[in-house]
Every structure is written in C-alpha cells, then in structure tokens.
A protein has these predicted regions:
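ATP-dependent carboxylate-amine ligase
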Residues: 1, 155-156
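Residue-level preference for the first positions of well-ordered beta-strands
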Residues: 41, 137-138, 193
Length: 205
C-alpha cells in the first residue's frame, strides 16, 4: 500500500470499530510483541496544557542526551505529527513500514477472534512499534480522552503528570469538574510518582 492508501485506511477505521477495553489494547500489544516493555514511559493527562507539557518533557529529556518517542493527538496537517522520534516526525517510509507490521499483528488478532483496534488504538500501536524499532529509551504519552479508560493507560509508566483540569468532553467524561477529575486521575498508580498541577479545590478533594 502507498502512504496515501494507508492514511485513507486508518481514517476509515472509525466506521467499522467501537471503543474497546484496556484488556483489548493489552492483547493488541501482545500480538505486536509487547513493544512497550523496557521503555521508560511518562504519561500525561489533563484538560489544558497536555501537549505543551509533553513537548517540554520531550525537549528536556533530549537535552540530557536521552532518546525519546513522543505520542500526541490530534494532528493538524499530517498524521505523522502524532509519532515523533527524537524531535522529528516519523518519515513517510517508516510510517508505511510500521503500518505493515501493525497490520500483520491485527490480522493475527482477528484470526484469534479479537476485534480490529480503534483509530486511536491503531495509531498508538504504530507509535509504540516505531519507538521500539528505533530503540527509544523514554516515551512521552499524551492521553487521547480522559485517562482511566484511555488506550494509553494500558501501559505501565515510570511517572505521570496531570495538568490543570476543567470542563471538557462532558458527553464522555462527566457533567462536573469532580467527575472529569476522577477520569483524569485514572492514570495514577501505586508504583510510580504523579506530578499534579495546582488545581481548583473541587478537583483536589
């Protein structure tokens, strides 16, 4: 498939898939060979400033000589913007190669009776495969929507960051700041540190 055909295929995914559980995403990574293993992942959620925080973290790590992968969404012009390696968008050639490797895993998933990954899951899988192929040490992940049930929460980070929280995506995350904060806080775990931006009183209670 050409680059253009691949992008068209990915854009069509929402038409024939539905939201999956985190277990489905973990199964997907299993078929991919668990590219997330051995990576130092920093997970970022919040309402405002997620993209900026991710960019700062990526730049700081590279300034210290670390190899980095950066996964953000949405893209503005080109799908490659979502998958960044050492400060540079993935090339069209590498994008195509990673797509083919991911599709091979997806076909094996479907043969095993599992559903096709969603649009976001598919791009997340491609990103993690790209970072693994390139031998990236650190990966900065921006949540797509919320946190608790977001596909990016299927991997184990070394740290997480929650930026300021406000009213957003209320049709999915809840009608109040407290409910939305609960969804965002779903990225917090017991085995790693969480860095929290100063929040409204309703969020921190």
């Amino acid at each position: 498939m050409t680059y253009k055909e691949i992008v068209t295929y990915i854009e069509e995914i929402p038409r024939f898939t539905r939201k999956h559980s985190l277990d489905h995403t973990r199964e997907m990574f299993l078929f991919l060979g668990n590219p997330q293993n051995g990576k130092k992942i920093i997970h970022v959620a919040g309402t405002n400033g997620k993209g900026s925080v991710c960019a700062y973290l990526d730049a700081m790590l590279r300034a210290e000589g670390k190899s980095t992968g950066l996964f953000t969404s949405p893209h503005l012009v080109k799908m490659n913007e979502r998958i960044v390696l050492n400060g540079k968008q993935i090339s069209d050639e590498d994008f195509c190669e990673v797509f083919e490797e991911t599709m091979q895993a997806v076909r094996r998933m479907q043969d095993a009776g599992l559903e096709h990954p969603t649009f976001f899951e598919f791009l997340f899988a491609m990103a993690m495969k790209a970072y693994d192929r390139a031998g990236m040490e650190y990966i900065v992940l921006e949540t797509g929507l919320g946190g608790r049930l977001d596909a990016t929460s299927s991997v184990e980070p070394v740290a997480c960051v929650i930026t300021s929280i406000g009213l957003d995506h209320m049709e999915y995350l809840g009608d109040t700041v407290e409910q939305i904060a609960g969804e965002k806080a779903g990225i917090i775990g017991r085995k790693f540190r969480c860095f929290l931006h100063r929040q409204h009183r309703e969020v921190t209670l």
